[in-house]
């Protein structure tokens, strides 16, 4: 598919969802507030793309994405017609997640000196722009449920559904943090150079960090349920988008190919693949 078509689809589909999910009557600059914030998310990616392309560097890619999450979340808080503790909680959860992951990925890419995913992309303006645009789509699609809650003028009672969503977020966030920390410690040990991780959470799932991320965004979507009505139910596509992207497009498939290149001939690795669940951890 041509880059311009990919870019157009990556902008139009999430922006359409943002327009449908916008709480009634909440505007920014005369337009639906959620749509304006979505467009702003893309604009931040495109602005960051310019110096990144000139320097042929991806070192600030993940950090830009995390800062975009925080920027649109704080902007939503600023323009929201309502201010209740559940809305503040949802905003805080997004900011905590984005701040933690942004710092982690920024430190990792600087320690590694780069990200191999971009080796053949950053030298092409069109392909690199696609990557930055897709990050904008990722931000908009994953955060739309949270932003819908923050912008809402309704005050539904906080009940079991909201609490269950918060618990899902907490469990998912904890799993992601622990998995990332375990892998970082594994890589930092010189004795593990050239080896694959199969200890800790990684002994129970081949991709526990992705499981945690899918679970936490599912939690945000569940927390949004009491606030949804009409076309706003479209935001429940958010966790499905996260799942699809991580399991079918850029996450697990990419790592699976790299794993086969590095350890495909290792019987221990093949045994690990056969005995360890791909995503949902074995209890």
Describe each PLM feature range.
Residues 3, 7-25, 41, 45, ...:
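Hydrophobic transmembrane alpha-helices
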Residues 25, 29, 33, 58, ...:
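Membrane-helix interfacial "entry" motifs
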Residues 31-34, 101-109:
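Short, charged cytosolic
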């Amino acid at each position: 598919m041509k880059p311009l078509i990919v870019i157009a689809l990556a902008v139009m589909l999430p922006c359409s969802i943002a327009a449908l999910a916008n709480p009634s009557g909440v505007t920014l600059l005369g337009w639906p507030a959620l749509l304006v914030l979505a467009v702003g998310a893309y604009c931040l990616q495109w602005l960051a793309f310019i110096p990144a392309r000139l320097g042929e560097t991806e070192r600030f890619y993940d950090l830009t994405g995390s800062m975009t999450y925080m920027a649109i979340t704080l902007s939503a808080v600023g323009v929201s017609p309502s201010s209740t503790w559940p809305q503040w909680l949802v905003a805080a959860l997004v900011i905590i997640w984005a701040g933690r992951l942004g710092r982690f990925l920024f430190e990792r890419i600087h320690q590694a000196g780069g990200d191999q995913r971009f080796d053949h992309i950053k030298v092409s303006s069109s392909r690199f722009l696609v990557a930055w645009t897709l990050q904008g789509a990722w931000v908009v699609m994953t955060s739309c449920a949270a932003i819908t809650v923050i912008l809402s003028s309704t005050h539904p009672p906080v009940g079991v559904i909201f609490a269950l969503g918060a618990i899902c977020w907490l469990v998912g966030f904890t799993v992601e943090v622990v998995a990332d920390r375990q892998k970082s410690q594994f890589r930092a040990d010189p004795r593990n150079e050239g080896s694959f991780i199969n200890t800790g959470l990684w002994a129970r799932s081949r991709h526990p960090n992705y499981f945690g991320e899918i679970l936490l965004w599912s939690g945000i979507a569940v927390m949004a349920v009491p606030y949804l009505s009409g076309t706003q139910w479209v935001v429940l596509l958010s966790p499905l988008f996260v799942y699809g992207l991580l399991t079918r497009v850029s996450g697990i498939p990419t790592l699976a190919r790299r794993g086969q290149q590095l350890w495909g001939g290792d019987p221990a690795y093949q045994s690990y693949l056969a005995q360890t669940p791909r995503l949902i951890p074995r209890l």
